[in-house]
């Protein structure tokens, strides 16, 4: 009889939890939409940013939240596009991954600095020997991407990282590269990217099948450090900033924005002033360094079929000439 009553009690507790999650749409960590809204309100500035004319939404929250991601997708039209530009046919993958993340905050709740001045640090070889590290570290927000290292390159690129965009094939797997003060942002290009994150968060086994190169097989970041980028940011980069066609000819591979352009688009939505470093490439010398680290050369960039580097360089030239951004490595 005692066991029977215990079973009824446990069932009631479980049912209460399920109903609570449904009614309040919380994630696994019990965060409600109202609490999310309070946390993620970006402090507005009295003046408009220089790049304001590029933005359709001036109070857009760039990270997905478990509590309301479906409503967000519907409101911004992301339910009509497949990845990497929307959530169509991938909502289940988003839900599973998001429910394992404790929050979707942009900045720390105690961060009261308004009108943030940001720098987006590319991985370009032009950063070699520039000694911009101290300058980069002086910004309110420092955005980096992929596996561009800080360790061993502090003089060139600084020590601090606020945000780092990544995808499964580009994320660090060496714990020496983990800064507990960094927020890492998954930029999902395919449903498998979300499945990869969910598997790592739940202790599952990762299969390399379906990735263009082997993804990280372990996660050096804690769940509280991880966010998932709203696909609207990638879609805006592709269609509104780079003006890519929605349908490519059959004889062409579809082009997608590089992580660098996506990072700049993110900066436009969370910063008041945006500076760039490391986005200039030397196409006249294919043997020149592609990155400020490693031995890769510009020849690899010229062989890339998935990005339109010419369109990206024209876009960068345009926003620099219009003083929408400042380029720290302009020569």
Curated annotation (Swiss-Prot):
Function: Transfers the sialyl residue from CMP-N-acetyl-beta-neuraminate to the terminal galactose residue on sugar chains of glycoproteins and glycolipids. It's alpha-2,3-sialyltransferase activity is specific toward type II glycan chains (Galbeta1-4GlcNAc) on glycoproteins and glycolipids such as neolactosides nLc4Cer and nLc6Cer, whose sialyl-products serve as precursors for the Lewis X antigen. Critically involved in the synthesis of functional selectin ligands needed for neutrophil recruitment during inflammation and lymphocyte homing to the lymph nodes.
EC assignment: 2.4.3.6
CDD domains found in the cross-reference section: GT29_ST3GAL6
GO cellular component: Golgi membrane
Family, per entry: Belongs to the glycosyltransferase 29 family.
Membrane topology of the entry: Single-pass type II membrane protein
Glycosylation sites: 129, 181, 282, 295, 308
Catalysed conversion reaction: a neolactoside nLc4Cer(d18:1(4E)) + CMP-N-acetyl-beta-neuraminate = a neolactoside IV(3)-alpha-NeuAc-nLc4Cer(d18:1(4E)) + CMP + H(+); a beta-D-galactosyl-(1->4)-N-acetyl-beta-D-glucosaminyl derivative + CMP-N-acetyl-beta-neuraminate = an N-acetyl-alpha-neuraminyl-(2->3)-beta-D-galactosyl-(1->4)-N-acetyl-beta-D-glucosaminyl derivative + CMP + H(+); a neolactoside nLc6Cer(d18:1(4E)) + CMP-N-acetyl-beta-neuraminate = a neolactoside VI(3)-alpha-NeuNAc-nLc6Cer(d18:1(4E)) + CMP + H(+)
Parts of the chain on the Lumenal side: 26-331
One of the GO biological process terms: cellular response to interleukin-6
GO molecular function: N-acetyllactosaminide alpha-2,3-sialyltransferase activity; sialyltransferase activity
Protein name, entry field: Type 2 lactosamine alpha-2,3-sialyltransferase
Keyword Transmembrane tagged: yes
Subcellular localization(s) per the UniProt record: Golgi apparatus membrane
Domain of life where this protein originates: Eukaryota
Main location: Golgi
Keywords, alphabetical: Glycoprotein, Glycosyltransferase, Golgi apparatus, Membrane, Signal-anchor, Transferase, Transmembrane, Transmembrane helix
Regions crossing the membrane: 5-25
Pfam family, one: Glyco_transf_29
Residue ranges, Cytoplasmic side: 1-4
């Amino acid at each position: 009889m005692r066991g029977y009553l215990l079973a009824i009690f446990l069932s009631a507790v479980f049912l209460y939890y399920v109903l609570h999650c449904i009614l309040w749409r919380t994630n696994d960590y019990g965060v409600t939409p109202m609490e999310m809204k309070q946390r993620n309100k970006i402090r507005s500035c009295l003046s408009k940013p220089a790049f304001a004319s590029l933005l359709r939404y001036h109070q857009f929250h760039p990270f997905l939240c478990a509590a309301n991601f479906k409503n967000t997708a519907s409101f911004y039209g992301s339910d009509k596009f497949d990845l990497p530009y929307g959530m169509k046919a991938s909502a289940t993958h988003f839900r599973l991954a998001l429910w394992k993340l404790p929050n979707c905050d942009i900045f720390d709740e105690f961060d009261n600095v308004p009108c943030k001045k940001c720098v987006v640090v590319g991985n370009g070889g032009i950063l070699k020997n520039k000694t911009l590290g101290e300058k980069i570290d002086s910004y309110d927000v420092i955005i980096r991407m992929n596996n561009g290292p800080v360790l061993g390159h502090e003089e060139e690129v600084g020590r601090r990282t606020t945000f780092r965009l990544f995808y499964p094939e580009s994320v660090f797997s060496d714990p020496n590269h983990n800064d507990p003060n960094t927020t890492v942002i998954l930029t999902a290009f395919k449903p498998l990217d979300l499945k990869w994150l969910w598997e790592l968060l739940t202790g599952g086994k990762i299969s390399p099948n379906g990735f263009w190169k082997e993804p990280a097989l372990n996660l050096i970041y804690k769940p509280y450090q991880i966010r998932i980028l709203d696909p609207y940011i990638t879609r805006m980069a592709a269609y509104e900033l780079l003006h890519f066609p929605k349908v490519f000819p059959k004889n062409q591979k579809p082009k997608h924005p590089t992580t660098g352009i996506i990072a700049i688009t993110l900066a436009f939505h969370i910063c008041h002033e945006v500076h760039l470093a490391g986005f200039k490439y030397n196409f006249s010398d294919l043997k020149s360094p592609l990155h400020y680290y490693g031995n890769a050369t510009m020849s690899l960039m010229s062989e890339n079929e998935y990005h339109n580097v010419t369109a990206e360089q024209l876009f960068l030239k345009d926003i620099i000439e219009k003083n929408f951004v400042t380029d720290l490595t302009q020569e």
